[in-house]
Amino acid sequence: MIAASLPEAQRARVHYVAVRDYYDDGLWADSVRRKVADAVPASRVALVACFKDATSYYLHHFPQWTMLNQEIDAGAPIGATAIRKVLFEAEDVDVSLGALAQLLPKAIAQYLKAWTMLPWYAPLVQEHRAIEAYKTRWRTAPYAPIFCTVDALVQTGGHVLLVKRGGYPGKDLWALPGGFLEPRERLLQGTIRELAEETQLGVLAPTLEEALVGVAVFDHPDRSQRGRTITHAHHFNLQTSQLPEVSAADDAALAQWLPLASLPAMEEQFFEDHFHILNHFLKLTHEQR
């Protein structure tokens, strides 16, 4: 879309490099620096920056580059939030696209029109509406809520137990079994309860407690679009050759043992940062701190 909005003479001057998410600022910044160095070796680098709001903090991760700070024009809002709102919330897509045509370069408006005809658009509309409905329920709270969740990573026989989410947000995406902690629960107790509710795993709670090999907190402020959500992931290694029986229940559409070897190629199929939780415990990729 960026290339389509540029004059033809400028397109050859612009290079695009993909950088994956890490939910780890240090790893991400290191990756950006490597990718830039590979794309333009032995070059002076300037970072064209705009400190829009608190989410712009990452610009400070590159002190070795010359920063060219751009002032915000109050009359020209920066960001795609308003565009997403029009695209995902209007009752009539054609009307929405007509409104966006006044805000965007012609090539971008045409691209979005074609994109809304693809099979991914309708599920994203449902995803957006589910997230907005979730946030709306908490807007009357006297302060921004912070949610506490638990997740279970159960490993055995070269496999890991995962669920497919049955509803939005994250419908049909793979995830670790888990959910919100109840008021009178300890973290481990809540993890085992959620595991049983979603997978019907045929393993007794005392056996799971003995199989616990690791616990980690995942607290990146942007790890969930629903709001600030801090999860406590518990890693269980049953160390059995047989895979215990499982059956999806509660809000899981599917519960299944998946081979560890298949996980690295599935990163884009996971809900929120659940692939990164798996990577933390299982070292699925070579990019680790």
Say what each PLM segment does.
Residues R11, A42, F147, Q155, ...:
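Short connector loops at helix/strand junctions that flank enzyme active sites
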Residues A49-D53, R165-G166, H232:
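Short, well-ordered beta-to-alpha junction loops that form the rim of enzyme active sites
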Residues A18, A49, L68-E71, L162, ...:
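Structural signal for conserved beta-strand scaffold positions within catalytic alpha/beta enzyme cores
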Residues D25, T55-Y58, P77-G79, P169-D172, ...:
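Short catalytic/ligand-binding loop motif for oxyanion handling, primarily in non-cytosolic enzymes
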Residues I2, F180-I277:
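Unchanged
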Residues I131-L176, V203:
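N-terminal strand-loop-strand
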Residues M1-A133:
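Nucleotidyltransferase catalytic core that binds NTPs
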